[in-house]
Amino acid sequence: MPKRKAPAEGEAKEEPKRRSARLSAKPAPPKPEPKPKKAAPKKEKAANDKKEDKKAATKGKKGAKGKDETKQEDAKEENHSENGDTKTNEAPAAEASDDKEAKSE
């Protein structure tokens, strides 16, 4: 790369301009003030609230049914063993009572 030539002794070099003359000549335009948003009428909000209340009520009902269904499924799963034989909860209770009778004798 060629080296820069040293300026002559009598000449003063100006600093390079970063902005063009066109941009520096014009001041920045002022930003327009934002307009305030219009407030919605209260009547429309009340109508929307009623609709939301109805939606919430129906959602609650669906959720309760879903919980009941899962409880029933859990109960069914407890009654079935992995190999397909059914287990009864009464059998262990009967064995426990037999053990108590044997101990008392």
From Swiss-Prot:
GO terms for molecular function: chromatin binding; nucleosomal DNA binding. Residues 1-105 are annotated as: Disordered. GO terms for biological process: chromatin organization. It holds the Pfam family HMG14_17. Keywords: DNA-binding, Nucleus. GO terms for cellular component: chromatin; nucleus. The keyword DNA-binding applies. It is found in: Nucleus. Disulfide bonds: none annotated. Residues 1-18, 32-56, 65-88 have a biased composition (Basic and acidic residues). There are two HMG-14 proteins in chicken: HMG-14A the major component, and HMG-14B the minor component. Binds to the inner side of the nucleosomal DNA thus altering the interaction between the DNA and the histone octamer. May be involved in the process which maintains transcribable genes in a unique chromatin conformation. Belongs to the HMGN family. This is Non-histone chromosomal protein HMG-14A. It comes from Gallus gallus.
